[in-house]
Amino acid sequence: MKIQTRHRQPLRILCVDDNVELVELVAEGLQFYGYRVEWASDGAAALQAIAPHPEKFDLLITDMEMPFLDGHDLVVKARAAGFRGKVIVFAGALSPKDRERFGGLSVEAIIDKPANHRQLIGVVARLQTELWEQSNADAA
């Protein structure tokens, strides 16, 4: 008997970018594909959304350069607060040094802006499949 898990539900995604028009566009695109999406316009606001209930989101999609708290520090603090979800860094032309900074943070993908929506949706769909498979293995 298979057990229904929460990952058979649409992914719960938090998108973070200080470019409000872009983050709204990304959120709307993900919602079109059935994902449940919230967004924040800076790292500090995102951390406020994550910290009280770190299990609320399955996926964090973050920019790198943002006011108050950059993408790297957001991931560090989110992990420290108990966030165990997947992470995609969606940022403009990261330097090799910035890419290296994300190396030890269990980041599933780094996508350079500008990217077409198919690339982002493809990575999100792959991560959802991984979560489904992991949930099924855990339930077995």
Residue ranges of model-derived segments:
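Active-site residues of response regulator receiver
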Residues: 63, 91
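Receiver (REC) domain active-site loop signature in two-component systems and cognate sites
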Residues: 66
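A Lys-centered signature of the CheY-like receiver
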Residues: 112-113
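Acidic, metal-coordinating helix/loop segments flanking the phosphotransfer/catalytic sites
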Residues: 39-59
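Conserved phosphotransfer cores of two-component systems
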Residues: 51-55, 77-84, 105
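Non-catalytic signal-transmission and effector/linker regions of two-component phosphorelay proteins
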Residues: 1-14, 24-27, 116-140
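Two-component/phosphorelay signaling modules centered on CheY-like receiver
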Residues: 20-38
